[in-house]
Amino acid sequence: VHETQFKLALAVLLLMVFYARLYYQRGRKGFEKVVIKHEKREKFLIELFALGLVPILFYLLTSWLDPFSFSLSTEIRWLGGVLIFMGNLLFIWSHRALGKNWSPLLEIRKGHTLVTKGPYRFIRHPMYTSIFLIGTGISILSANWIVSLSYMLPATIMYLIRISDEEEMMIERFGDEYTEYIRKTGRLVPKLSILRAQSNNRP
């Protein structure tokens, strides 16, 4: 399989991801913000993440990053494409569950509700899970160190910096309800104990 085929597959999959983001971004206008935290920092993190996408464009459009490739079998690389697709499905599912509650920044809106349906039934931050799934898929499908690091490093920095503040903000807004929600769910992956309990409770 020629490298061009992997690049074309990655381009198509990323266009699907960006289309999903633009679609839901369009629906967030017109809601009144009540609380917004660390606005400048949050905007910087988003810009850092966007900047990390630039090397991916160089990979797709040029051969400049070819010296940074690493060896993977064809089958494994196509598995990367599957991970990107699955990550995008989780991304869309998360957006649909959140509805008007979604924001790219740390903010509480008027009428903000605690969402515990869809993927939020099992994990508190499925969008981060989808971002890491997509990033893992990009790393495998491209088989390129620069592409992998340019996506995963900003994504990891964003997650580590903001996750505690995000949960603290939710506790301030929802109190014991969110504390109980934390007990029942994992941050990025479901708690096995909860999955077993739900499985045992099925008729």
Features from the language model and the residues they span:
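Membrane-anchoring alpha-helices and their flanking helix-loop junctions
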Residues: 1-116, 134-203
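Histidine-centered phosphotransfer motif of kinases
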Residues: 117, 121-129
